[in-house]
């Protein structure tokens, strides 16, 4: 493994700027079996190397893929350490749960040393936290929200401050910070174009994890509930069956849309073929400003079925905060000032 300066910067960003770990603490790194294709061992090795160099007692525990009882098996082990870093999807399964774990958890969406050494992993964590807060503030001030996309999505509703409360957010530290707090969908209506794939949210495990859509389909939504689907009959039936199966499997509300949010980190990238693993694609690229995603199927965040909307626009009282998949930070004082403050944000948004 080449321990480059950029990699060292990314490792320090994770350990100190995000996890805020100190040398008198203990660290466990949960590494998902690299053979599963989601995480590479080199990222765990790099973090362990830095931690041990400063005197942090560090353990790497390799685990399998996520299961629906993953939390129960690991809770006791994790609580024996001051800090846990997840290079594993199981760290994302209970990201909205704050009740079971007593110690600090970090869920990493950086999946390899190369990923960590890129702008995705090196952008100062605090800058992204402040940028997220700026966007939350903008939404809290907003009145009418309109969401569109080039394929024909038209989805709108009114929001108020109660929709931006932090208790809707996750109970685990995320690295890097990729999305603002989810916006409740219960006041939104319209049509959303479903294209390419329906994918899981990373919450529970089920098969098939994703379904391919041979034709685009319209989801008609009324006040946060899916009324019906319109389009090619076979594709619509496939979608309906998927929702039926997942909702029965977990005994959840089939056609509920819990919330939505869009990516805020332009350094997010995905270089593999989408068709090889749509689940991995959607659960990696969601942090890009080019994508907005919906949490559907279930009356909780993040739901179980994800809708990915590409090159969306989001208008707040007719002013675009996102336009065709580009985050228009200059249009709002809060985001403009945040980018002006942080060189790291200027490097990903401007340079």
Regions found by a protein language model. Name each.
Residues 139-140, 210-213, 253, 287, ...:
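Short solvent-exposed loop/turn micro-motifs enriched in small/polar/acidic residues
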Residues 212, 228-230, 234-295, 346-349:
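Dual-mode signal for accessory low-complexity, basic/Gly-rich regions
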